């Protein structure tokens, strides 16, 4: 471990294997708090490299509680959080709509980072249990098309880093790991990041981790596809990464203001999402969710974003998507 420390403190990049060794030790509680703080700040100051991020993610995945991985195509839609936008839970709403149109979504989530309520806070407000066993969650994925995997249940080693992260009060590598350590290991993912500077590093990391197809997005300060600003995309497809930009017109939609997407407490967000999934949501909410679902559909090979948006809008306005929420709550 001293060799790894010395490389870090000299400003040198770690290999994937070295990063994996380091983070395996971290999540086993083998570093002191001062050592961990020094490691995280050293990496932050020079910038974390994709090989280092991938090594950390592999350490978390290798030590995660197991999930029975399906042999059918499935995906995740998730953001890093930390964008400060305090928006409604767009990725969570998008997961329900995606399931309604036939996609399989194993959504990895945690408590709030950037909004007043994260995906897990919102699910709890709906009465959806967060403590499902891996086998029960897999059954929900099979039968309802959607399951939620609560990060602390699968990644208990995070607890060793929590005190230092709270004391540092700054973003570190741990802030970008969440979307990369889904224990179901989906082959497809739509991942939002809090800074455009993370687009290529995270796309490169997804390539190293072996994702089949994925899109990393940022839009005007938000960690998702948004309609208030152009969405910057780094798309991974069969080992190649392409950068491009999307605007509302690419989805056949009109722009909205960022203030139109503001959320609130878990209970407020629960009501906003319930209205949306019953086909009675605000235009900005409905269309923002539809745009995210449209890009997720593209990752499944349905390339026409405007047609995809129409499919998603039809599912939302049918009012039937709320049945997915009720079905998950009933299985508590």
Curated annotation (Swiss-Prot):
Q: Which GO terms describe its biological process?
A: L-tryptophan biosynthetic process
- Does the record carry Amino-acid biosynthesis as a key word? yes
GO CC, sorted alphabetically, is: cytosol
Q: Which InterPro entries match?
A: Anthranilate_Pribosyl_Tfrase, Glycosyl_Trfase_fam3, Glycosyl_Trfase_fam3_N_dom, Glycosyl_Trfase_fam3_N_dom_sf, Nuc_phospho_transferase
State where anthranilate 1 binds: 79, 110
Residues reported in the UniProt entry to bind Mg(2+) 1: 91, 224
Q: Which Pfam families does the annotation name?
A: Glycos_trans_3N, Glycos_transf_3
- What EC identifiers does the entry list? 2.4.2.18
Please share the entry's free-text remark on the cofactor: Binds 2 magnesium ions per monomer.
Residues passing through the membrane, by range: none
Family recorded in the similarity comment: Belongs to the anthranilate phosphoribosyltransferase family.
Q: What is this protein called?
A: Anthranilate phosphoribosyltransferase
Q: What is the phylogenetic placement of the source species in the record?
A: Bacteria, Pseudomonadati, Pseudomonadota, Gammaproteobacteria, Enterobacterales
Q: Which gene encodes it?
A: trpD
